[in-house]
């Protein structure tokens, strides 16, 4: 029995990306990060684009693929305790609208970054590695998989 809870979901983490306005807020947050980085003096535009991409992908990796459990006390017998937020989203159903949005966003940001860095080799390699570290854990084949025992418990 959960006393004092106002939500009707067993695990509120499952539906948070389907909330009204969350996609717009997400894109505006990326834009705000980019504007803040652009306001730093003596930093070139290609470096700002690469930093925007790296910071976005690092935050996405940490919040979606590293942090496990839920901040709420859920009546699911601890099932969510061992799942990352990505694995909890939409009750684990693959290829939902939210999952597609969160998969396509780093790809679009990668294309923009590659264009504005003029496909410079160093920036291209850094951004490609960053993109792959975010996209590979999103694949359905990696649902619940812990490579080398990292983040197992």
Curated annotation (Swiss-Prot):
Intervals, Extracellular compartment: 118-121
Cellular component aspect of the GO annotation: endoplasmic reticulum; endoplasmic reticulum membrane; serine palmitoyltransferase complex
Stored InterPro entries: ORMDL
Membrane-topology descriptor: Multi-pass membrane protein
Keywords: Endoplasmic reticulum, Hydroxylation, Membrane, Transmembrane, Transmembrane helix, Ubl conjugation
Family: Belongs to the ORM family.
Function: Plays an essential role in the homeostatic regulation of sphingolipid de novo biosynthesis by modulating the activity of the serine palmitoyltransferase (SPT) in response to ceramide levels. When complexed to SPT, the binding of ceramides to its N-terminus stabilizes a conformation that block SPT substrate entry, hence preventing SPT catalytic activity. Through this mechanism, maintains ceramide levels at sufficient concentrations for the production of complex sphingolipids, but which prevents the accumulation of ceramides to levels that trigger apoptosis.
Name of the protein this chain belongs to: ORM1-like protein 3
Gene name for this UniProt entry: ormdl3
